[in-house]
C-alpha cells in the first residue's frame, strides 16, 4: 500500500512537470541510402521522440544512377507529388515535428512535398524543425521544408554531410542545445538493463538512486520520467 502511494505521488509529480514543460516530439524522415535514417535515429535517441519513416507507395530503385539522373530529376522538373505508402501517423499528438530528408538536385525530394502537403496532415500550430543530409551542401532543402509549412513555427535546421551522418552525436547534441530541445520531455521511456546513469533517479519507494548502471529490474522515476528497466 505504501509503495503504491509513493509511486502514485511520484507519477503525480511527473504529470505536473510534463504539464509545465513537457512537449511531445516526433521525428519524421525520408531516407534512400540510409544516411538520413541514421541522423533521424540519433535525433530520436537524444530527444526521446517517436519516429516515423516517410515512404513512397512505389519504392525507389536501388540504382543510384537511375535514381539521380532519371527519376528524381524528372520528379523535380514535373513538380511531381509521388504517392505516399501510408498516412498512419497522427500529427495531432505532437507539438514538435522534425522533418528530414537527403538533398536531391539542390532541394528536398518531391516525396517530402507529398508528405508536407498531404490533406491528412495539418502542420498548423506545430513547431517544425528541418534537417537534411547532403553530399556537397544543404542548398535550399531546409528552406523548402520551412516554406512548405507556412502556418507552423520553425526552429533552426541542421544539415550534415551524408558521410558524417553515422557519427554525428556531438553535432546533433550541440544543435539541440542551441534550439532548446534537449530538456523537453517527450514521454515515458523504456530502457534496457544497461542504461547509463542520470542526474535524478528514484526507485518505487521514493529513495534516490545514485546510479542507474546495473540497477535491478523495476520502475523508476528518472529525470522526471517513468522509466522501466526490464
Give the predicted meaning of each segment.
Residues 219-230:
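C-terminal tail/sorting-segment detector
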Residues 183-205:
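Residue-level detector of functionally pivotal "anchor" positions at catalytic/ligand-binding pockets or at interdomain
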Residues 67-152:
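Helix-loop-strand module that forms the ligand-binding subsite of alpha/beta enzymes
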Residues 157-185:
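Glycine-rich phosphate/pyrophosphate-binding loop and the adjoining helix
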Residues 15-19:
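Sec/Tat signal peptide C-region and signal peptidase I cleavage site
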Residues 20-96, 108, 177:
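N-terminal beta1-alpha1-beta2 submodule of the flavodoxin-like/Rossmannoid cofactor-binding fold
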Residues 1-4, 230:
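Positively charged n-region of N-terminal signal peptides that target proteins for export
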Residues 4-14:
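Sec-dependent N-terminal signal peptides
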Amino acid at each position: 500500500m505504501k509503495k503504491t502511494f509513493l509511486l502514485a505521488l511520484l507519477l503525480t509529480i511527473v504529470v505536473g512537470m510534463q504539464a509545465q514543460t513537457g512537449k511531445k516530439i516526433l521525428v519524421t524522415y525520408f531516407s534512400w541510402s540510409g544516411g538520413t535514417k541514421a541522423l533521424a535515429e540519433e535525433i530520436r535517441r537524444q530527444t526521446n521522440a517517436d519516429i516515423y519513416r516517410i515512404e513512397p507507395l512505389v519504392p525507389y530503385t536501388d540504382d543510384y544512377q537511375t535514381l539521380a539522373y532519371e527519376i528524381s530529376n524528372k520528379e523535380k522538373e514535373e513538380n511531381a507529388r509521388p504517392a505516399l505508402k501510408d498516412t498512419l501517423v497522427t500529427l495531432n499528438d505532437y507539438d514538435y515535428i522534425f522533418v528530414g530528408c537527403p538533398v536531391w538536385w539542390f532541394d528536398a525530394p518531391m516525396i517530402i512535398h507529398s508528405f508536407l502537403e498531404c490533406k491528412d496532415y495539418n502542420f498548423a500550430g506545430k513547431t517544425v524543425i528541418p534537417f537534411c543530409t547532403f553530399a556537397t551542401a544543404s542548398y535550399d532543402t531546409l528552406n523548402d521544408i520551412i516554406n512548405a509549412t507556412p502556418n507552423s513555427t520553425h526552429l533552426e535546421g541542421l544539415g550534415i554531410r551524408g558521410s558524417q551522418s553515422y557519427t554525428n552525436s556531438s553535432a546533433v547534441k550541440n544543435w539541440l542545445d542551441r534550439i532548446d530541445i534537449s530538456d523537453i520531455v517527450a514521454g515515458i521511456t523504456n530502457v534496457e538493463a544497461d542504461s547509463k546513469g542520470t542526474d535524478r533517479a528514484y526507485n518505487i519507494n521514493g529513495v534516490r538512486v545514485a546510479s542507474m548502471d546495473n540497477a535491478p529490474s523495476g520502475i523508476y522515476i528518472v529525470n522526471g520520467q517513468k522509466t522501466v528497466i526490464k
